[in-house]
């Protein structure tokens, strides 16, 4: 009986230590998510402005630019999957990877080859474990993205988009990430970057009119200059949304883990007390039995 009590004491001690870790991680995620949400909000004006500019240039020009023209046949598609570097965030990365798998299956059903690019160690480990190839990987700052990484990703994707199919190039580019809606709602999302599609949320309302531009230099040169920046801003915006979603998911996961730890501590405390009461009862019974035996003799 005493050994059982010691086991419960050890479980209470270890669970209490784990609860402290969960609480610390919850507080860290809570403190960082405010900054992450602010970065998401700060990125929107630039993303909206450059989207309108590119939309205006594309809609008012009649040039056959590869970045805005739908190809006759799409044979290979690039899929950029944005996950996290670290775990302890519930089903955050698993949900994104499930969405990416669904997109990959859909593209293959349409007869397209898929070339995968990954952001985050979780996606890297997922594909490595299954011995599935990926073109490039970026890791190290998924919960605090930097624009330089978005520029590097954008340059790699644009280079492959400009490369011929026979040389390993792609005909369209998709991004799979988690859109941050609120602290309790984050949604795995797929967007197509190229050929150019204006995202509905960033498009101008029907009452707004696109500005009329007089292009200097030529329209094609304007698109050549604008579109790389447009792609970089869209990728960076997706990374910021994913970072806020990751922190929100981690905060919820750590709070849930802490609550579960509290429940376990209560359970082990109750079992320990029950075992202690049983031990005391047994000792009293033995004392009474011994006293009765002495009296009988």
From Swiss-Prot:
Where is the organism placed in the taxonomic lineage, from the top? Bacteria, Bacillati, Actinomycetota, Actinomycetes, Micrococcales
Q: Say what the protein does.
A: Produces ATP from ADP in the presence of a proton gradient across the membrane. The gamma chain is believed to be important in regulating ATPase activity and the flow of protons through the CF(0) complex.
Q: What UniProt keywords are attached to this protein's entry? A: ATP synthesis, Cell membrane, CF(1), Hydrogen ion transport, Ion transport, Membrane, Transport
Oligomeric form and interacting partners: F-type ATPases have 2 components, CF(1) - the catalytic core - and CF(0) - the membrane proton channel. CF(1) has five subunits: alpha(3), beta(3), gamma(1), delta(1), epsilon(1). CF(0) has three main subunits: a, b and c.
What InterPro entries has UniProt attached to this entry? ATP_synth_F1_ATPase_gsu, ATP_synth_F1_gsu, ATP_synth_F1_gsu_CS
Subcellular compartments: Cell membrane
GO biological process, any = proton motive force-driven plasma membrane ATP synthesis
Q: What is its main location?
A: membrane
Membrane topology summary: Peripheral membrane protein
What NCBIfam families does UniProt report for this protein, alphabetically?
Answer: ATPsyn_F1gamma, PRK05621.1-2
Going by the entry's taxonomy, the superkingdom of the source organism is recorded as Bacteria
Molecular function as annotated in GO: ATP binding; proton-transporting ATP synthase activity, rotational mechanism
For this protein, the record's Pfam families field holds: ATP-synt
Q: What is this protein called?
A: ATP synthase gamma chain
Q: Which family does it belong to?
A: Belongs to the ATPase gamma chain family.
In the UniProt record, what gene is named as encoding this protein? atpG
Q: Name one GO cellular component term.
A: plasma membrane
């Amino acid at each position: 009986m005493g050994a059982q009590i010691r086991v419960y004491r050890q479980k209470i001690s270890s669970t209490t230590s784990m609860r402290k870790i969960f609480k610390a991680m919850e507080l860290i995620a809570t403190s960082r998510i405010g900054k992450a949400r602010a970065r998401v909000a700060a990125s929107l004006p630039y993303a909206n402005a450059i989207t309108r500019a590119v939309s205006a240039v594309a809609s008012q020009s009649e040039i056959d630019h590869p970045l805005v023209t739908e190809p006759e046949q799409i044979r290979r598609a690039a899929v950029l999957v944005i996950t996290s570097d670290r775990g302890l965030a519930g089903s955050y990365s698993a949900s994104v990877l499930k969405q990416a798998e669904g997109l990959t299956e859909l593209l293959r059903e349409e007869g397209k080859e898929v070339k995968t690019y990954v952001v985050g160690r979780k996606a890297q480990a997922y594909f490595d474990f299954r011995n599935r190839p990926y073109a490039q990987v970026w890791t190290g700052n998924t919960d605090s993205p930097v624009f330089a990484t978005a520029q590097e990703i954008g340059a790699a994707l644009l280079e492959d988009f400009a490369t011929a199919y026979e040389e390993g190039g792609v005909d369209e580019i998709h991004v799979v990430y988690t859109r941050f809606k609120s602290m309790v709602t984050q949604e795995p999302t797929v967007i197509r970057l190229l050929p150019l599609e204006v995202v509905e949320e960033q498009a101008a309302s029907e009452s707004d009119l696109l500005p009329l531009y007089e292009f200097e230099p030529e329209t094609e040169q304007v698109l050549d200059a604008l579109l790389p920046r447009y792609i970089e801003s869209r990728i960076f915006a997706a990374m910021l949304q994913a970072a806020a979603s990751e922190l929100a998911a981690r905060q919820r996961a750590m709070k849930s883990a802490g609550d579960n730890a509290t429940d376990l501590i209560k359970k082990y405390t109750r079992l320990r007390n029950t075992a202690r009461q049983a031990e005391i009862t047994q000792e009293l019974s033995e004392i009474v039995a011994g006293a009765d035996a002495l009296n009988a003799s």
